[in-house]
């Protein structure tokens, strides 16, 4: 893999095991929008970029080689060999083998921890389209405006100064109270997000569950997508259905150290095959 600087964009060569739609529009992150030309425009780590793929060449507009080194290499999880991981986990169960073959371009995004926490609080009893709308309004109302008119995700410190009523423009309902509680506990150090990278898994989950409204599912999603705890195995309605129907008598522990990656293959496969249920 090589990063080449071009005019206001970078080209990354030899990119494998990445499908932008499967990765950016599958319920991991809620700030990416599909463009008419097949590219995706989004904001992460305070950077507004457009990402496209041409076979094994990836282009990131409005980015530099330093941005790739410091942000995007990690964000797209290029340090992991997903081909080898698929080979390993596909031996666990025939249905998982089928699911991994169905969407081999899924990668686990390494998102900002606080953004992952808030967006999965918002995801409770919600659909992807509505989640994206709430997240967009949260950023437009309380995030820092970027040069191109987009908005960064607001910081915990910014949101901690607000009340649930201040979030009324989001139209997020009961989730407003949870967002403010999360921001306040992160900002004042009661909940230490950085510790969740290294704590034992159950302790990391318990740390996040100090926040009002954060149960196991939101905590597991935050750990998987915000801390890259790829042993996490979030269970939502789709996954509960999939486990009962396709993997009876199995649980997340049965999928090993890459359970979170297996979960994404199963989640996507289940959503795309409703006839199985």
Please annotate each region the language model reported:
Residues 1-277:
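HhH-family (HhH-GPD) DNA N-glycosylase catalytic core used in base-excision repair
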């Amino acid at each position: 893999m090589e990063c080449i600087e071009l005019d206001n964009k970078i080209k990354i060569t030899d990119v494998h095991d990445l499908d932008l739609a499967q990765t950016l529009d599958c319920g991991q992150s809620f700030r990416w929008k599909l463009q008419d030309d097949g590219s995706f425009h989004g904001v992460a780590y305070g950077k507004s970029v457009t990402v496209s793929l041409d076979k094994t060449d990836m282009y990131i507009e409005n980015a530099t080689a330093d941005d790739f080194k410091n942000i995007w290499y990690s964000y797209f999880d290029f340090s992991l060999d997903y081909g080898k991981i698929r080979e390993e986990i596909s031996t666990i169960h025939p249905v998982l083998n089928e699911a991994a073959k169905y969407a081999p371009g899924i990668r686990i995004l390494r998102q900002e921890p606080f953004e992952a926490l808030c967006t999965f609080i918002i995801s409770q009893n919600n659909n992807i389209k509505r989640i994206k709308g709430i997240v967009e309004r949260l950023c437009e109302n309380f995030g820092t405006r970027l040069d191109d008119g987009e908005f960064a995700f607001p910081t915990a410190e910014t949101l901690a100064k607000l009340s649930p009523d201040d979030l009324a423009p989001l139209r997020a309902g009961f989730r407003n109270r949870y967002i403010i509680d999360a921001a306040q506990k992160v900002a004042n150090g009661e909940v230490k997000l950085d510790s969740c990278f290294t704590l034992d898994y159950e302790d990391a989950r318990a740390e996040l569950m100090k926040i009002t409204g954060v149960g196991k599912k939101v905590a597991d999603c935050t750990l998987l997508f915000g801390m890259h705890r790829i042993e996490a195995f979030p269970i939502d309605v789709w996954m509960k259905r999939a486990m009962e129907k396709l993997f009876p008598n199995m649980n997340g522990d049965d999928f090993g150290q890459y359970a979170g990656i297996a979960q994404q293959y199963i989640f996507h496969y289940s959503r795309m095959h409703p006839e199985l249920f």
